[in-house]
Amino acid sequence: MAAKDVKFSGDARQRMLRGVDILADAVKVTLGPKGRNVVIERSFGAPRITKDGVTVAKEIELEDRFENMGAQMVREVASKTNDLAGDGTTTATVLAQAIVREGAKAVAAGMNPMDLKRGIDIAVAAVVKDIGKRAKAVASSAEVAQVGTISSNGDASIGKMIAQAMQKVGNDGVITVEENKSLETDVDIVEGMKFDRGYLSPYFVTNAEKMAAELDDAYILLHEKKLTGLQALLPVLEAVVKSGKPLLIVAEDVEGEALAALVVNRLRGGLKVAAVKAPGFGDRRKAMLEDIAILTSGQLISDELGMKLENVTLNMLGRAKKVLIDKENTTIVNGAGKKKDIEARVGQIRARIEETTSDYDREKLQERLAKLAGGVAVIRVGGATEIEVKEKKDRVEDALNATRAAVEEGIVPGGGTALLRARKAVGRINNDNSDVQAGINIVLKALEAPIRQIAENAGVEGSIVVGKILENKTETFGFDAQKEEYVDMVAKGIIDPAKVVRTALQDASSIAGLLVTTEAMVAELPKDEPPAMPAGGGGMGGMGGMGF
């Protein structure tokens, strides 16, 4: 076991704080409409330019192991917020830095870290409740567009596109973001179906960066039972190889010899193939396989119908223009199914929804209906260079996540205003324990951090902005950093999803609370690398005595 280096109390916290500051300072320059870009070196290809907080955070590794631990904890804040809300990662990082800084000062002044943590938790709970009360449901497509515009850094065309896509496929519809070959960014509504089953083996992946399998103009084999043996599969595999098209296999499961053969064929390049488990269970699985069959103009290979796998021909397989498979989901886009068949199936499902008395069954039938009738919206991001396209795609994905969050939990005034106004709720809390009260005050001060940073990135003094906003009693009054003026944020369309604001604060306080209560840090000592062997073969001279 390698020797360890251990740091305690003040020394540990100081090093950790240095790491937190390095990461947070790199991330927070991207906050707000006048946030700057960060350029990230790539080991190959052109550098990446981004304004996405979590992308910057994920790239940072520090040489000092103790500083790196602090940085990685804050990176976790950005990642967690991104996973839960899909946006707000920079806000979460700024909040975490503010709480850790003030917390470290309080601990250095001799306060009890556990009481401070309790105070932080009490204050955060009050803010979350306050944000919930302020949140207003998204009522119109215009509000969806406003959220998208703010999250994409003030790009109204992106906001409009997302609102248009959501209108077409519904709030629960599937919207994906792709890179466009041309200069234009456009939205395309495609008939399609998405279900929650990913690839059975990572060896099916065709796009290593996204860890996804992408099959164009694919055949689709739908099988009701498990596939274990290879023999029955061979005729259909040979027919598909001759056609030169990729193949998607959807079955109850694919394992053993069958899965091994598919993986080997995929790796050798003989057959572009992917296999996924069928969605659902029992009778519902069979119904969903039939839905896919109708959508792709294929046949479900079922023993009940007297069909044998070895007798399957190409015209019994479904067809789709594109199939996208990641670790958790499969999306079938532009199936070859006839419109009248799909409409008839949709009619059947609607009739069953009206007949059913079970809420659970109704919910599952509505899911199937959305998958069949909703379709998939694809936003294609274009640009003059690959770097520009990637930067814009980051912003489109942020905006899409933010609009989904807004539809889910409503909207609040943007630009850091909601958190600043929540100070009132925290200010009302009084605790007899002075250390717990100090923890509450840490959050009270941290709630100013996002709006200060937005103002500073716009070249304005943060404290003046905070003071001006707090002087005005109108709840929606805030600072428009784009135009550098004080306005009614909601009337101006500067709004944030309540879920993003709430998640950012909860994740930031959770990790910051752990950092504040840290008393010791343990890291491996760097190993001394042995000197490299000298080059050349001069050392072999002693072999002469061996009679060669």
Curated annotation (Swiss-Prot):
Keywords: ATP-binding, Chaperone, Cytoplasm, Isomerase, Nucleotide-binding. This is Chaperonin GroEL 3. GO terms for biological process: protein refolding. NCBIfam families: GroEL (TIGR02348), PRK00013.1 (NF000592), PRK12849.1 (NF009487), PRK12850.1 (NF009488), PRK12851.1 (NF009489). Gene3D superfamilies: GroEL (3.50.7.10), GroEL-like equatorial domain (1.10.560.10), TCP-1-like chaperonin intermediate domain (3.30.260.10). The keyword Cytoplasm applies. Together with its co-chaperonin GroES, plays an essential role in assisting protein folding. The GroEL-GroES system forms a nano-cage that allows encapsulation of the non-native substrate proteins and provides a physical environment optimized to promote and accelerate protein folding. It comes from the Bacteria. It comes from Nitrobacter winogradskyi (strain ATCC 25391 / DSM 10237 / CIP 104748 / NCIMB 11846 / Nb-255). Transmembrane segments: none annotated.
